């Protein structure tokens, strides 16, 4: 099984002010380590495309995407798929990769979107997946404005479809999460786990393919240590990817 994992990285640019002087530093961070390890530990081949490489290297056609059984978008906004260097820097005509991703799923591929500040609608609405072909392929409706639900006190997920393959072998009790993106399940979607009244995990069919969402994060800060260390962490992602690939 082959997975293309996109996003889940960032650069922090800091300004340090000391008296009348200031200087800047930059730090590059990848947050996908535990997710990648969970999938690799189950024998799943993971190709990782960090956020800064997505605009230039994300596949440009449904046929190229079909080399992978499942595509995962995690904390990477729609603009990074729409604006390739060819278009943004050289004004060249290029494929609409959101449409190609929709065609990939419709043709039999699997798509998972994981939540974060640049997922779904995202912070200040900047992820911008509302009204796109990717939203068409997902089992949820995405809002137009900032959809973050911050829960510093922690929110405990509740299982609503215990028999779904995504939950096979998982512990009955779930750890707290510190936030998620608020979405609405489409008619016919299976809402497997909720945070309050909102979907945390939703799954559905689209054309000949499958899609799913996990509306919280696979990494900090919405994913606290108790979630990352939870015995169900690795099985959850393996189950989701296996289901999306049509193997469960």
Question: For the regions a protein language model found, what residue spans apply to each?
Answer:
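Extracellular ligand-binding/catalytic regions of CAZymes and related secreted enzymes
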Residues: 1-6, 110, 190, 206-210, ...
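Aromatic-Pro/Gly-enriched surface loop or interdomain linker
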Residues: 1-77, 114-121, 225, 238-242
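Short alpha-beta junction capping motif
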Residues: 3-5, 10, 64-123, 208-214
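An acidic, glycine-rich "communication" segment
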Residues: 8-18, 32, 106, 110-198
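Short glycine-enriched, charge-decorated loop/helix-capping segments at active-site entrances
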Residues: 19-24, 85-90, 227-230
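Solvent-exposed, acidic/flexible segments
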Residues: 28-32, 90-98, 104, 127, ...
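Short, surface-exposed beta-strand/loop micro-motifs that present aromatic residues
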Residues: 197-207
């Amino acid at each position: 099984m082959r997975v293309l994992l996109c996003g889940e990285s960032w650069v922090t640019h800091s300004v340090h002010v000391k008296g009348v002087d200031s200087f800047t530093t930059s730090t590059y961070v990848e947050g996908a380590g535990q997710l990648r390890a969970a999938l690799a530990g189950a024998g799943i081949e993971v190709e990782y495309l960090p956020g800064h490489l997505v605009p230039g290297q994300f596949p440009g056609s449904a046929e190229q995407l079909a080399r992978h059984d499942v595509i995962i978008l995690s904390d990477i906004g729609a603009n990074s798929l729409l604006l390739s260097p060819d278009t943004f820097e050289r004004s060249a005509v290029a494929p609409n990769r959101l449409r190609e991703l929709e065609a990939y799923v419709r043709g039999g591929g699997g798509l998972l979107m994981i939540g974060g500040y640049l997922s779904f609608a995202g912070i200040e609405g900047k992820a911008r997946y509302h009204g796109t072909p990717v939203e068409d392929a997902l089992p949820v409706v995405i809002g137009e404005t900032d959809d973050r639900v911050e829960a510093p006190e922690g929110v405990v997920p509740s299982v609503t479809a215990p028999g779904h393959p995504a939950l096979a072998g998982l512990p009955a009790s779930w750890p707290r999460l510190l936030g998620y993106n608020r979405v609405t399940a489409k008619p016919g979607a299976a809402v497997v786990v909720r945070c309050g009244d909102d979907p945390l995990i939703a799954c559905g069919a689209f054309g000949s393919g499958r899609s799913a969402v996990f509306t919280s994060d696979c990494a900090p800060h919405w994913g606290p240590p108790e979630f990352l260390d939870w015995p169900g962490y690795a099985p959850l992602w393996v189950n989701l990817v296996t289901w999306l690939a049509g193997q469960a």
